[in-house]
């Protein structure tokens, strides 16, 4: 198969204006911002950043000679100007409010200010790019593409919204001409990109804080589609099939008139056996070593992107057996008191459905994990954003009703103001309407949640912790307790 990547890299480089020698990131600890900062630091730019939350990412940045300010105050900008002068660039994300002290000071001094998407666009223009967008599966799909490229000896630059197991990082500064990145649709900024290959995994209304309705989202995705040299889209998604026609289709349901099909044959909750077809021609039987039908779709998308980029299937197959999910995507954390702890980033009803579906398959197929045979699905869900919770409250309840025991924590606001009557208890109320017999708990804080987990769960439970906020702290606290009590199990799921 010929590559659909054009040979215009040199022309792109000639058109691309360079960035100022020093770049300051407001909120540098975020998953997207930190990846950009690390790439630019390795390219030789002087980098600084501020973040009020301590995490391992900041430590990594400091190890790479990035200066970190632990607060976001006006004096940070003054300090930077003393050292670097006014020829600096300030980078912000959509999460940074207009009244941020550093941002206000940068505006006062008339400094150059750019959105993070403009920095990503700058990097895209310098490479042959594969840009992944869509409502769900962006991080997993871009992780898969990066992994397959790497095992095909293509050494890509990668900017990913999660930790890629191969690199144990959210970025890679490769030495080839390829760049793989996610295009975040949450704020509409993806229309700034001009990808060689664009890929849309699926389309569903999620970010109700930015989009009025599904039609509004579709119009934005159409703009992105028009800017792609070659567009790969998911035939199995009604919203894509009916509204956005790509250059190439992939599917896990259909072979006829499909460019890349990956049809499932067997599944046991940890891997899927599938038949691979190109333009209706059978190519091979392959084993995808990750669970979940949605992850098979992500794998099909990744294979399609690699083939369109010109990578031989025999080279792709070498990497398929090495595929692993990124962090917090049905991630097995280990055993806690003979309960299996799993974390997932699910924060939309469809994502919760997908995560619970994997858990159900594990139980139905009696697949033994970490020396236990899971028998019940216990879900711990942290709603993310008041606006999303209000919009999808009934849908959240319907998805969670497929569990055997449910804990719903207070809403992670992500900077949003509270909405009267919208909280964890209102979801619990909707859940009771669907299943009056379901055991539901709505604790007011993490301390009470941990107490309830100890009291209400039993051995052989599969405890599925879901959410896009800081709910991962729960598993950390549970395992920390084991360490403190010298009861830690070293039997971590592979």
Swiss-Prot record:
GO CC aspect terms: cytoplasm
A matching Pfam family: Mur_ligase_C
Pathway named in the protein's UniProt entry: Cell wall biogenesis; peptidoglycan biosynthesis
Record field: catalytic activity: UDP-N-acetyl-alpha-D-muramate + L-alanine + ATP = UDP-N-acetyl-alpha-D-muramoyl-L-alanine + ADP + phosphate + H(+)
Main subcellular location of this protein, as a coarse class: cytoplasm
InterPro entries per UniProt: Mur-like_cat_sf (IPR036565), Mur_ligase_C (IPR004101), Mur_ligase_C_dom_sf (IPR036615), Mur_ligase_cen (IPR013221), Mur_ligase_N (IPR000713), MurCDEF_pg_biosynth (IPR050061), UDP-N-AcMur_Ala_ligase_MurC (IPR005758)
One GO biological process term: regulation of cell shape
Subcellular location: Cytoplasm
Domain of life: Bacteria
GO molecular function ontology, one term from the record: ATP binding
Keyword tags: ATP-binding, Cell cycle, Cell division, Cell shape, Cell wall biogenesis/degradation, Cytoplasm, Ligase, Nucleotide-binding, Peptidoglycan synthesis
Binding site residues for ATP: 134-140
EC number: 6.3.2.8
Similarity section: Belongs to the MurCDEF family.
Function according to Swiss-Prot or TrEMBL: Cell wall formation.
Protein name: UDP-N-acetylmuramate--L-alanine ligase
Organism: Prochlorococcus marinus (strain NATL2A)
């Amino acid at each position: 198969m010929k590559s659909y990547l054009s040979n215009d890299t040199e022309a792109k480089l000639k058109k691309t204006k360079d960035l100022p020698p020093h770049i300051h990131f407001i909120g540098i600890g975020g998953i997207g911002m930190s990846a950009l900062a690390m790439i630019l630091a390795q390219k030789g730019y002087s980098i600084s950043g501020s973040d009020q939350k301590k995490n391992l990412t900041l430590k990594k940045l400091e190890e790479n000679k990035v200066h970190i300010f632990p607060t976001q105050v006006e004096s940070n900008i003054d300090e930077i100007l003393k050292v670097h002068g006014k020829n600096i660039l300030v980078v912000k994300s959509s999460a940074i409010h207009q009244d941020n002290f550093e941002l206000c000071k940068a505006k006062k001094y008339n400094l150059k200010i750019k959105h993070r998407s403009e920095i990503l666009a700058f990097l895209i223009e310098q490479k042959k790019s594969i840009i992944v967008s869509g409502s769900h599966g962006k991080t997993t799909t871009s992780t898969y593409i990066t992994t397959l490229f790497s095992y095909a000896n293509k050494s890509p630059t990668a900017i990913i919204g999660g930790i890629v197991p191969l690199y144990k990082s959210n970025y890679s500064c490769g030495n080839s001409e390829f760049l793989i990145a996610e295009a975040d649709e949450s704020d509409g900024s993806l229309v700034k990109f001009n990808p060689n290959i664009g890929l849309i995994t699926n389309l569903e209304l999620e970010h109700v804080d930015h989009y009025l309705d599904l039609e509004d989202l579709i119009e934005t995705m159409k703009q992105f589609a028009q800017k792609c040299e070659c567009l790969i889209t998911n035939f199995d998604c009604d919203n894509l099939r009916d509204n956005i026609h790509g250059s190439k289709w992939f599917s896990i349901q259909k072979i006829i008139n499909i460019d890349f099909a990956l049809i499932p044959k067997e599944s046991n909750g940890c891997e899927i056996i599938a038949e691979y077809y190109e333009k209706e021609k059978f190519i091979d039987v392959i084993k995808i070593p990750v669970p979940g039908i949605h992850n098979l779709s992500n794998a099909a998308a990744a294979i399609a992107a690699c083939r369109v980029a010109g990578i031989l299937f025999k080279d792709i197959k070498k990497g398929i057996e090495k595929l692993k999910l990124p962090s917090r995507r049905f991630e097995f954390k280990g055993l806690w008191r003979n309960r299996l702890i799993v974390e997932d980033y699910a924060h939309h009803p469809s994502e919760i459905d997908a995560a619970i579906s994997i858990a159900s398959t594990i139980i139905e197929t009696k697949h033994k994990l970490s020396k236990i045979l899971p028998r019940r699905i216990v879900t711990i869900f942290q709603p993310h954003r008041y606006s999303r919770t209000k919009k999808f409250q009934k849908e959240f309840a319907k998805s969670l009703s497929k569990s055997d025991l449910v804990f719903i924590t207070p809403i992670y606001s992500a900077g949003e103001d509270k909405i009267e009557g919208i909280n964890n208890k209102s979801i619990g109320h909707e859940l009771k309407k669907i299943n009056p017999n379901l055991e539901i708990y709505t604790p007011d804080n993490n301390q009470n949640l941990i107490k309830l987990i100890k009291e209400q769960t039993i051995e052989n439970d599969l405890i599925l912790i879901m959410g896009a906020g800081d709910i991962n702290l729960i598993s950390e606290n549970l395992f920390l307790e084991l360490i403190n009590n010298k009861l830690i199990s070293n039997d971590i799921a592979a």
